[in-house]
From Swiss-Prot:
Aux/IAA proteins are short-lived transcriptional factors that function as repressors of early auxin response genes at low auxin concentrations. InterPro entries: AUX/IAA_dom, AUX_IAA, PB1-like. It is found in: Nucleus. A motif (EAR-like (transcriptional repression)) lies at residues 43-47. Homodimers and heterodimers. Expressed at low levels in roots and shoots. Induction: Not induced by auxin. It comes from Oryza sativa subsp. japonica (Rice). Residues 177-281 form the PB1 domain. Residues 1-80, 92-125 are annotated as: Disordered. Pfam families: AUX_IAA (PF02309). This is Auxin-responsive protein IAA7. GO terms for cellular component: nucleus. The gene is IAA7.
Length: 300
């Protein structure tokens, strides 16, 4: 009995030792799995998963074995790259065959152009955007015009327009206001006369005679005027146009020049006259009187 009990103890010890020494327990297995996972996830210059360096560390190989494993890995990579290049070449040849098969005659290509893809589509879109935006961009001359030059040009243009507007307004004023002031030497009061009521110089001279005959008589000496009242009423102011009488009719134009009435046609006279004056013939220059007499003789 004693020997049997000792043999049973040895068997149980062997089993316990075998289970502890020969086969690893669950706790040790779990620890090994964690270490492998950490080695797999650690950062390195190689591919994820540990690579040949992790395998060399686990197996305890020497440097020669690691170099041989690296060479083998490089050979595997070369085989893979050659296989990839071979697959790429077969794919390219297959795509070229399809393109040649789908390619038709030039008429069909013109009738059905291939759709633009990739860079061609992007280039066409950019060209379309450029064509649509180009008309909206302002055209700038060279050299550029400075601001003060533009202001000078606009101001000069505005001044010219203003001058033209003033001339047009003056012409309209002449047409709309035909009443002209008329003054006579020796008579302090002036009168106004409507030139549109006349159509010749003779009618104008008769109207001037009627306007100033009574006023001129009132300016004389009262005693002389009372003694010869009836005779003065019959005396008319004659020689206004040719300078042969006591008074001569002269007009002033818009330029400030004094001209004898009757030297220009009637229409020009009406458009250029600014003021009429009845001046004494003795105060006028001899050249004006001579030109007036020559004009009268030519008309006769």
């Amino acid at each position: 009995m004693g020997e049997a009990s000792e043999s049973m103890k040895k068997i149980s010890r062997g089993r316990l030792g075998g289970s502890w020494m020969g086969e690893p327990s669950d706790h040790h297995r779990h620890g090994d799995e964690q270490e492998e996972e950490e080695k797999t996830l650690e950062l390195s210059l190689g591919l994820p998963g540990g690579g040949w360096r992790a395998a060399c560390r686990d197996k305890g190989t020497t440097t020669k074995h690691s170099i041989a494993a690296a060479a083998a890995a490089d050979d595997d990579d070369g085989d893979k790259s050659s296989m990839l290049s071979l697959g790429y070449s077969t794919l390219v040849s297959h795509s070229q065959g399809k393109a040649n098969k789908n390619k038709g005659s030039p008429e069909e290509e013109e009738a059905h152009p291939p759709p633009a893809t990739g860079n061609n589509a992007l280039a066409s879109n950019n060209n379309g955007c450029f064509q649509t935006r180009s008309p909206s961009t302002p055209v700038v001359g060279w050299p550029p015009v400075r601001t003060f030059r533009r202001n000078l040009a606009t101001s000069s243009k505005a001044s010219l327009e203003l001058q033209n507007g003033k001339k047009a307004a003056k012409a309209e004023e002449i047409k709309r206001a035909p009443f002209i002031k008329i003054n006579m030497d020796g008579v302090p009061i002036g009168r106004k006369i409507d030139l549109n009521a006349f159509d010749s110089y003779e009618k104008l001279s008769l109207a001037v005679d009627k306007l100033f005959r009574g006023l001129l008589a009132a300016q004389r000496d009262p005693l002389t005027a009372g003694a010869k009242d009836c005779q003065q009423e019959d005396v008319a102011i004659s020689g206004l146009l040719d300078g042969t009488g006591e008074y001569t009719l002269v007009y002033e134009d818009y330029e400030g020049d004094k001209v004898l009435v009757g030297d220009v046609p009637w229409g020009m006279f009406v458009s250029s006259v600014k003021r009429l004056r009845v001046l004494k013939t003795s105060d006028l220059s001899s050249s004006l009187i001579t030109s007036g007499r020559k004009r009268t003789a030519a008309e006769c």
